[in-house]
Amino acid sequence: MSLKLHNLKPTPNSRPEKHRKGRGHAAGKGKQAGKGQSGQNKRKGHRLGFEGGQTPWFRRIGKRGFKNVNHVEYQVVNLSSLEERYSNNETVTLESLFERNLIRRSVELRPVKVLAKGKLTKKLTLQVHSVSQAAREAVEKAGGKVEEL
């Protein structure tokens, strides 16, 4: 007989014999089939997340808060950065803010709001989505004006 792939067989006793579990006492693995006493794990088992009667994790953790779908997250620009990057009598637009790396391009998703951190001495015209009350007062005190988009 020639040695070919379809003729190959393992050496005798090199592989353990298969046990067909739960097929009677004579087969050696009958009745409880190696599963021990007849409990929950002998059967189908339990669903994912089941903790044996203990209150499961997803119910122990409280239900806290929610995400408001109407919440608007602004890109913040402070007066101090406008003071540094703009000269007198300039107009602050969304394009100029982007060119000076003060905002990201995603203006549709995150509108721009100017806040009053720092001091403003230059006369500027702001064309942005929103301005805080203190920032509006500081701009108007410096002789500038605010145009909300």
UniProtKB/Swiss-Prot annotation:
Family matches, as Gene3D superfamilies: 3.100.10.10
Keywords: Ribonucleoprotein, Ribosomal protein, RNA-binding, rRNA-binding
Disordered as annotated region, ranges: 1-54
Molecular function in Gene Ontology: rRNA binding; structural constituent of ribosome
Keyword Cell membrane: no
UniProt xrefs under InterPro entries: Ribosomal_uL15, Ribosomal_uL15/eL18, Ribosomal_uL15/eL18_sf, Ribosomal_uL15_bac-type, Ribosomal_uL15_CS
Pfam family of the protein (one): Ribosomal_L27A
Function: Binds to the 23S rRNA.
HAMAP family (UniProt xref): Ribosomal_uL15 (MF_01341)
Quaternary structure annotation from Swiss-Prot or TrEMBL: Part of the 50S ribosomal subunit.
The name this protein goes by in its record: Large ribosomal subunit protein uL15
